Curated annotation (Swiss-Prot):
UniProt topology in membrane: Multi-pass membrane protein
TM segment ranges: 208-228, 243-263, 277-297, 315-335, 361-381, 404-424, 439-459
Pfam families reported in the protein's UniProt record: Methuselah_N
Sample GO molecular function, one term: G protein-coupled peptide receptor activity
Full protein name: Probable G-protein coupled receptor Mth-like 9
Spans within the Extracellular topological domain: 20-207, 264-276, 336-360, 425-438
Taxonomic lineage from the root: Eukaryota, Metazoa, Ecdysozoa, Arthropoda, Hexapoda
The keyword Zinc-finger belongs to this UniProt entry's keyword annotation: no
Predominant subcellular localization, coarse grouping: membrane
Length: 513
């Protein structure tokens, strides 16, 4: 049977080889500065004439990909030239004589042809002038981005400045030429204006809400588990209970931040806040898996009857936290490096969390999680076989009843298997989506799986915890039993409504109104 670790390694190497192959091709300029010149006029010297601009051969190259939302996708090989380096470019959302339909999100033919020949241009000295578009810019019609932001109800949507180099200012932000496109829009009845539509990375809809609602319910369940484990002294003091508490605390904080990012438009967050929230969520979630791995190792050492001193245990926890902090800064360095975009996590760019359109999430997120879960599974398997190596008359193991340790171990192992299955599903779904180039920024099935794990945690981590069950039997069930005995003794009435018990301190009384 092929190890999942080997499969992940093969996938990672194939991805890396493909990305290096793409990055190694020498392109004369950035994709955002190019235009498809296949339909241009080829000159005798090998140059191309396109929209009145002569593109020399050294500024042309064949491209086997296209860029949408800043991410490369496979495409038929075509010729592109660095036209925008020779003359500023602006993008139109739709071909000539078509307009963008904000209701159906496509290009449609208007009832009356809307010619867009002029645009307001803002100069460096802040003066504004109406200029003929094709005199100042090369017009290109490309997708650029899948989702376009349209908000005709607010006045600031109609307020923007187009500069001489093709960049656009709106909402106190500069947008490059591949982050917006122009289209005529109806501002007032029968009054159309040429308006730029910015690329919208934030998505809403039923997927987001299903994910958010399921995650919030899961967080509430985990908070209940955490509070009950923390309130029971024996559970709180045991090594197993401590690690589960640390795990739940990290997971609650991490998923709470992810839900916040799912519901919050990144455009309404500063770059620093967006980036820091994403990295904090990453740190907490990775730390939760480290605690699961430590708990698995702790069970293995117990069944091997290898005692670990408290100082060593505290040191190992501190080193684990430091290792996750180091991993967090390693991912931050990768984000700020000059690596190809496919190797970057993408935090703080289009999204505050990982960009699922690149391979970075597999390298920095799914990869470490898979390694930690494989380590946990291996430790649990070794611990399981170590149980049968114990002497038959063993009652206690390192000062704890063997029955308690075994019960907790079986419940924890079942939970680990569930976590492993959920995350293998996550990785497989991501790889299939990445290969097909069909992405969902929010996968609502992830929220359903998170909720399922919370329910499993309630049953296995809380319901099967013998310390909690003992506390519940003493403090809750016994109290209810005593109360029911008292009630049964006090409130025994005969058919007439009088008390049956003659020794009851409560005597029937007659009250008149």
């Amino acid at each position: 049977m092929v190890s999942p670790l080997i499969i992940l390694l093969i996938i990672w190497l194939s991805v890396g080889a493909k990305s290096v192959e793409i990055a190694s091709i020498n392109h004369p300029c950035a994709y955002a500065h190019t235009v498809n010149i296949t339909d241009g006029l080829r000159m005798k010297d090998g140059s191309y004439s396109y929209a009145g601009v002569v593109v020399p051969p050294h500024l042309m190259a064949e491209y086997s990909f296209k860029v949408i939302d800043g991410v490369e996708y496979r495409a038929k090989k075509h010729l592109r030239g660095c036209v925008c380096l020779l003359k500023p470019c602006i993008s139109f959302c739709c071909p000539e004589n078509l307009v963008f339909d904000a209701k159906h999100w496509n290009c449609t033919m208007p009832h009356q042809v809307r010619e867009s020949t002029h645009v307001e241009l803002t100069y460096a000295n802040r003066t504004v002038d109406q200029v003929r578009i094709r005199d100042r810019f090369v017009v290109r019609t490309e997708l650029g981005c899948r989702n376009k932001f349209v908000d005709k109800k607010h006045d600031n949507f109609w307020q923007w400045d187009l500069f001489e180099n093709g960049t656009l200012r709106r909402d106190n932000r500069l947008w490059s030429t591949d982050e917006y496109c122009f289209s005529p829009l109806e501002h007032n009845p029968e009054q159309w204006e040429l308006t730029p539509l910015n690329c919208e990375r934030f998505q809403t809809g039923y997927r987001v809400w299903i994910y958010a609602i399921c995650s919030i319910i899961a967080i509430i369940i985990n908070i209940f588990i955490l509070s009950l484990l923390g309130s029971v002294r024996d559970a709180r003091k045991s090594h197993y209970g401590q690690l589960i508490i640390y795990y739940l605390l990290s997971m609650i904080v991490g998923y709470s931040l992810l839900v916040y990012l799912a519901l919050k438009n990144p455009m309404k967050l500063s770059h620093v806040a967006c980036r820091n929230i994403g990295f904090l969520a990453y740190f907490c979630i990775m730390l939760s898996f480290v605690f699961l791995a430590i708990c698995s190792l702790d069970f293995l050492l117990k069944f091997k009857q290898k005692a670990v001193r408290s100082s060593v245990r505290r040191l190992s926890l501190a080193l684990a936290v430091l290792a996750v902090i180091g991993l967090r800064f390693l991912v931050s360095l990768a984000q700020d490096s000059k690596l190809p975009k496919h190797f970057k996590p993408g935090m703080g760019e289009d999204y505050c969390w990982f960009d699922v359109r690149t391979w970075g999430i597999l390298i920095y997120y799914y990869g470490p999680i898979a390694l930690l879960l494989i380590f946990s599974i291996v430790c649990c398997l070794k611990a399981y076989f170590s149980i049968y190596e114990l002497p038959p008359d063993t009652q206690y193991i390192l000062g704890t009843q063997l029955k308690i340790v075994k019960t907790h171990f079986y419940a924890f192992s079942a939970y680990i298997v569930g976590v492993f299955a959920v995350w293998i599903r996550e990785i497989v779904v991501y790889i299939m989506a990445r290969v097909r180039e069909h992405f969902f920024i929010i996968d609502f099935w992830s929220g359903i799986c998170i909720l399922g794990l919370a329910i499993a945690g309630f049953i296995l981590l809380l319901g099967k915890n013998l310390h909690v069950k003992s506390w519940w039997a003493i403090n809750v069930e016994s109290s209810q039993t005593d109360l029911s005995i008292i009630n049964a003794r006090v409130y025994k009435f005969d058919e007439k409504g009088d008390l049956k018990s003659s020794d009851s301190p409560y005597k029937p009384t007659v009250t008149s109104l």
